[in-house]
């Protein structure tokens, strides 16, 4: 008999936007509007990766948000503003010592591009965010994932990751090709559907396995 206590704990954290939420992933195609009934967070690239590794996982994601700006250009509540707090409505500092991930995956950038942020400003914001995350997660691998929807900020993301990696070898980058040339991978409002999430999960699983040496194992979380 095996159970959760039979294995050393693996911990993953996903910091993201609508893709990590599962926005529109159950939709029949990009022509469909968003509906809560077609958003399934249990079938995202993040959830698939978590189950593959049998990991204890935390998700911090909110649709439309970015590093500097949201998808409509507002800079009122970017991810770095609330990530370090208990909640949006109770902005007390979060106690990060209570739970430390082995790998933290950051999947952000698409909404900044749509919100009119320049590449230079995004790079500076991403560098600052990575350094702040390192301050609260001193031993975690930090993996920036980008490209599944929009590829325009690849130069900015690369520059940010390379800047921090020069001082921190546990920082890395995973670029995933966009769904935009592939209508068969698009759900509501041109978001990734189940096929796209599965493709992204395969790429992420391969990357994390290479980084950590983790193999697949039974998952005890839904």
Annotate each language-model stretch with its function.
Residues 20, 54, 109, 131-138, ...:
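Sec-exported extracytoplasmic/periplasmic mature domains
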Residues 3-5, 90-100, 131-137, 211-215:
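Surface-exposed acidic, glycine-flexible loop patches that form ligand/cofactor-binding
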Residues 148-222:
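Catalytic His-Asp segment of secreted/periplasmic serine-dependent ester chemistry enzymes
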Residues 46, 50, 127-130, 201, ...:
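Extracytoplasmic/secreted envelope proteins and their assembly/folding machinery
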Residues 11-15, 20, 57-61, 102-107, ...:
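Structural recognition of the beta-strand scaffold that forms the well-ordered cores
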Residues 25, 30-124, 148-160, 187, ...:
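Conserved SGNH/GDSL esterase-like catalytic core that processes O-acyl groups on lipids
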Residues 1-41, 210-222:
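N-terminal secretory targeting modules
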Residues 117-142:
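Glycoside hydrolase catalytic-domain groove-lining segments
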């Amino acid at each position: 008999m095996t159970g959760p206590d039979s294995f050393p704990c693996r911990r993953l954290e996903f910091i993201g936007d609508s893709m990590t939420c599962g926005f529109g992933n159950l939709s029949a195609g990009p022509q469909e509007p968003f509906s809560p009934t077609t958003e399934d967070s249990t079938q995202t690239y993040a959830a698939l990766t978590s189950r593959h590794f049998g990991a204890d996982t935390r998700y911090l994601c909110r649709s439309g948000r970015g590093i500097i700006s949201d998808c409509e250009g507002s800079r009122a509540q970017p991810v770095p503003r609330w990530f370090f707090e208990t909640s949006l409505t109770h902005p007390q500092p979060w106690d990060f010592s209570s739970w430390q991930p082995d790998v933290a995956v950051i999947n952000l950038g698409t909404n900044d591009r749509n919100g009119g942020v320049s590449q230079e400003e995004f790079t500076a914001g991403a560098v600052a965010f990575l350094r702040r995350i390192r301050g609260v997660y001193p031993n975690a691998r930090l993996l920036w994932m980008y490209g599944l929807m929009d590829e325009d900020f690849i130069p900015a993301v690369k520059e940010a990751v390379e800047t921090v990696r020069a001082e921190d070898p546990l920082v890395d980058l995973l670029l995933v090709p966009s769904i935009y040339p592939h209508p068969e991978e698009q759900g509501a409002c041109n978001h990734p559907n189940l096929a796209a999430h599965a493709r992204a999960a395969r790429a992420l699983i391969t990357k994390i396995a290479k980084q950590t040496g983790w193999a697949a194992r039974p998952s005890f979380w839904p």
